[in-house]
Amino acid sequence: MNEPTIAQPVLFADLIDRPVIATFDQPHASSDGGAVLLKAADRHVGVVAALTATVPDARAPTRVTHGVGDLIAQRVFAIACGHPDGNDGDRLADDPIHKLLLGRDPIDGGRLASQPTISRFEHTAAPRMLLAMSHALADTVIARHRRRRRRGVRLITIDLDGTEDQTHGAQQLTFFNGFYDHWCYLPLVGTLTFDDEARQYLVAAILRPGNAAGTAGAVSLLKRLLPKLWRAFPGVRLRVRLDGGFATPEMFAHLEAAGVEYVVAMAGNAVLARHAEPTVAPLRAIVATTHDTATTYAEAAYQAGSWAAPRRTIIKAEVVWHPGRAPRDNPRFVITNLRQTPAWIYTHVYCARGDSENRLKELKHALAFGRTSCTRFWANQLRITLTAAAFVLWQELQLRADRTALRGAQVPRLRQALITIGVQVVRSVRRIVLHFPQAHPDAATWARLARALGAVPA
């Protein structure tokens, strides 16, 4: 077994009034001490077990050191803790907390899987397995919120958002995308909003080639999600909210055949501009007088050439004023089958989808959603799925934090306060004790969350 390399001690001779020596020599210690909260969260959600149940393992059991469940758990917890790279497996192989997360003895338990083992596992990914994992992820999230919302749900809003994942190597199906001006993948992310809650919950994440159409995979994803939601929440109204990249005849036909509400942005064109002109024209005169942006709302019956019939179109008529610039028309269009007023539909329904982009930011910047550096496309889809599972655990912690000082905090702040905590692990015959710093600034909040996840006073 390779011994870990210990950093050489360093000396700050004159940093303060006496020498300061720093050395990495504390055995049985970890910098991810708070990660036991993630394991406790998974006990309530069950996402690791759900994913594990979908993955076959054809290896001879007598020759297996790291089972599929251990590999999935190791990767999900590592990603959640801020260690998204497969190489992190080598650095964390003897970390006592990461051993504990897999149910191993934190002191004497076997080392965790190495980077080559993780890489081999990732490259076993195949379409059938990944589809089963996608179903398991969605089923787990939906079941969790069915238990949470025991009093029932009237409305579930489904947001689908495409995003770009810049690539830098020779991965399969990465292509140059002229819109983004670089080589990339184009993942598709699905979230759910229950009634008028402020938070969107991740329910699906699909990797798409870099040259995929904006709607690629969207209809098939809805075909999977809608029946699951109706089974879990009988009688619920389903509303699909999309940006302009999804406004295709196929999408509208599917939404209407499925009998769901929809609010879909539509890119402007000459015909829509003519519909908007009677509403925009008076605003120009207002802006010329007030020197301030003016906005109003209207509607029209618009029929694209590829549509069999006209659809209700909400018009946001706006003339934008900037000092030192000429006023600029800024009309926006939304296609919908809702019956409320144009202003209400645009401001209260469509604009609310903007917050779903914050979920993309959390995925990208806090959980390295774009760490798709495997050679094979399906291996990268597996990484996307495991990252989504890690985010599901974080969203469970966000729910529990809503009654604490960390209400509304995103993943980076929560990880700083709750997970990245130095800890010394002490094991006896009867128990394992985690010794955290007495001066940790969020100790009270940590303890409150631990109790919310099932811990009791010791």
What are the roles of these predicted feature ranges?
Residues P4-T23, E261-H365, A452-A458:
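An anionic, glycine-rich sequence signature occurring as long contiguous blocks
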Residues D161, V236-A247:
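Acidic/histidine-rich, metal-coordinating catalytic segments
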Residues D90-R91, D105-I107, L238-R239, A401-V411:
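Short, glycine/acidic-rich hinge or "gate" loops at secondary-structure transitions
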Residues H28, P61-D70, R325, C374-I384:
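Structural motif
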Residues F252-E261:
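Short, surface-exposed basic-aromatic patches at helix termini and helix-loop junctions that form
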Residues A41, G89, Y346-L382, L386-L397:
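Short amphipathic alpha-helical "interface-anchor" segments enriched in bulky aromatics
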Residues M1-A213, V219-A232, A258, Q398, ...:
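Dynamic "connector" segments at or just before major functional cores
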Residues L393-T420:
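Conserved nucleotidyltransferase catalytic core and NTase-mimicking acidic/glycine-rich helix/loop elements
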